[in-house]
């Protein structure tokens, strides 16, 4: 997944049902609030909840905010409600992690060896120890950012789940397959910002009334010299279709 500054969709609607320039500005990242100076999710601004929002999930991405020792990941969830309103949810406090065999690291202080390792754990919050499918005790290694997980994993002879993309990690751990319920903690710009461990952040069935907007692209490439390889032949045709406008 990209680490581009994608800030998502606010609720804009023009009189003719199209999408105005304001929405494009939000998608491009030219509008909205970012949190840039605090790492701990518990210290960030979470507005009071006004209820819950259920939405069909259309895309999940992430960005890195802050800098240096204060970098932290933010998961961005995009989707639509049953009323077909677009939503952008910022989830803070999602931990990037992987597992290593406990016997390989039990004599090491990993948080002292690596600045990018924030914590190590051998048990989940309920006290159940982490194990491989063969019953081998595992240690959970929590990194500062997803990038750190990718850089550190090869330092260990054995590791598990280090290749799972960070947005997919969020979906797997929250058991999200189609829909998501979130507490309605809205920032001033209309986006929702929640903690990962919020009890109201849970998977739900997708709202069946939601009509996701799909923009389909298709290209045709000069193939007179055989099957074209990436970047070798010119594009001769580019087609785009918008499912809302039903126009090409």
Q: What is each residue range found by the language model?
A:
Residues 1-248:
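The two-metal-ion catalytic cores of nucleic-acid processing enzymes
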């Amino acid at each position: 997944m990209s680490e581009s500054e994608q800030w998502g969709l606010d609720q804009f609607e023009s009189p003719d049902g199209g999408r105005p320039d304001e929405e494009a500005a939000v998608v491009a990242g030219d509008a909205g609030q970012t949190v840039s100076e605090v790492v701990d999710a518990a210290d960030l601004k979470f507005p009071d909840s006004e209820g819950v929002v259920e939405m069909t999930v259309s895309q999940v991405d992430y960005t890195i905010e802050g800098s240096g020792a204060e970098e932290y990941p933010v998961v961005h969830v995009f989707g639509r409600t049953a009323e077909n309103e677009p939503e952008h949810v910022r989830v803070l406090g999602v931990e990037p992690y992987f597992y290593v065999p406990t016997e390989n690291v039990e004599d090491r202080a990993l948080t002292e060896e690596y600045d990018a390792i924030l914590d190590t754990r051998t048990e989940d919050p309920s006290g159940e120890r982490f194990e491989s499918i063969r019953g081998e005790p595992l240690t959970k290694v929590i990194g500062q950012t997803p990038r750190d997980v990718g850089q550190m994993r090869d330092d260990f002879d054995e590791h598990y789940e280090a290749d799972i993309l960070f947005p997919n990690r969020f979906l797997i751990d929250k058991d999200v397959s189609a829909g998501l319920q979130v507490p309605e903690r809205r920032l001033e710009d209309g986006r929702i910002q929640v903690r990962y461990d919020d009890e109201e952040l849970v998977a739900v069935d997708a709202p069946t009334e939601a009509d996701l907007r799909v923009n389909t692209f298709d290209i045709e490439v000069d193939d007179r010299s055989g099957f074209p390889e990436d970047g070798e032949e010119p594009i001769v045709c580019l087609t785009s279709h918008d499912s809302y406008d039903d126009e090409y």
